[in-house]
């Protein structure tokens, strides 16, 4: 009787553990889907009256390839490629798709649309790329670095942040 009870408890524990693992895995994946990237971007764009971005698999492949190259040391160095680009880094599971875009959009507080400038000593180019009216396609990737952190790369087509031009 004790063996049967132990066996049932072991089976229950195993099934419970597997179920928890699947829920956590799905939750982590669900927080980094194409739709998560699009929703975060398009909410910011709608706030300033800019049309939504669409997902582009070719742009996403570029983002994935470049982010994978950065994974060795996790240094945020821009690719200077054919697309506009935003990069973010975070430790652990903190850096989700939505969190990366939120970090970029939080730069809005430093952007003055009337003068098309950033506040002195501040950065706002990530924000302006997110809301750049002429950028209509996006592709993003999230890669774990060798040091355990994560890099998120989003690329935009056509690129934004054209000097002297307003994003919207």
From Swiss-Prot:
| Pfam families according to UniProt | CAP (PF00188)
Asked if the Swiss-Prot or TrEMBL record annotates the protein with the keyword Iron, the reply is no
- Record's keyword terms, sorted: Disulfide bond, Pathogenesis-related protein, Plant defense, Signal, Vacuole
Q: What is the residue range of the signal peptide feature?
A: 1-30
InterPro entries reported for this sequence: Allrgn_V5/Tpx1_CS, CAP_dom, CAP_sf, CRISP-related, V5_allergen-like
Q: Look up keyword Disulfide bond and say if it applies.
A: yes
SMART domains in the cross-refs: SCP (SM00198)
**Bilayer-spanning residue ranges:** none
- Annotated coiled-coil segments of the chain: none
Its function, per the record, reads: Probably involved in the defense reaction of plants against pathogens.
User: What family is this protein classified in?
Assistant: Belongs to the CRISP family.
The cross-references to PANTHER family, in alphabetical order and at most eight, read: CYSTEINE-RICH SECRETORY PROTEIN-RELATED (PTHR10334)
By what name is this protein known? Pathogenesis-related protein 1C
What organism is listed for this UniProt entry? Nicotiana tabacum
